[in-house]
């Protein structure tokens, strides 16, 4: 059964701890142990069971049963190395599951996510991802994907006492400035929503501009080894469309 120890779930059978490299599937806990479909506060425990982590491990059990095992050949190939064709730069928003909305298989997308799908200029973390993707993985396409109802974009309108978020969002502030210089101040909720949509899409274009400031990427684009694309995902409709 699943037991909670040091805030982690371990699998015990016959009183012995199974090694981490065990090839056995994780078995669901006995029926009636807890209601897997119920909503519990984060970190809540019922009779020693870590509900949040248990849900993730049960999800992995289903993944191995319905996806990994039927496609074992594909996953064994990936175990020896990756060869993605696309670097995907997206937002960290939990409502967007990149592989799910694109139906991309494991191994097809090399993914970098952050708040606001931002390409910071002269950032070591981002530069490392970009260099590895372009120089070593030799991706053919780089995608920057924005989305509707983006909290990062809406935060551009608010004062904040946060230590890090405002500094990070300075990388997107120019998108807000551009749109506000083109349109009248919104007077209705619909107009306000449209303004945010325009800023979200302008931000994608701005981040493409930032991307092109990296010499290794610009060189790859100039030599036609890499193409850059701007996409926008609508949370309300599920539609993903090209905007740049």
Region annotations inferred by a language model:
Residues 14, 91, 150:
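Functionally engaged cysteine thiol sites
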Residues 18, 31-35, 40-51:
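Short, Lys/Arg-enriched N-terminal segments with co-localized hydrophobic residues
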Residues 9, 19, 24, 28:
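Cationic, low-complexity basic patches in intrinsically disordered or flexible, solvent-exposed regions
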Residues 49-84, 107, 116-140, 151-244:
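Divalent-metal-activated hydrolytic enzyme cores
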Residues 95-112:
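Catalytic core of membrane glycerolipid acyltransferases/transacylases, capturing the structured
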Residues 2-9:
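Extreme N-terminal basic, low-complexity initiation segments
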Residues 89-91, 113, 143-147, 229-234:
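Short beta-strand segments
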Residues 79-95:
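N-terminal low-complexity or amphipathic/hydrophobic leaders
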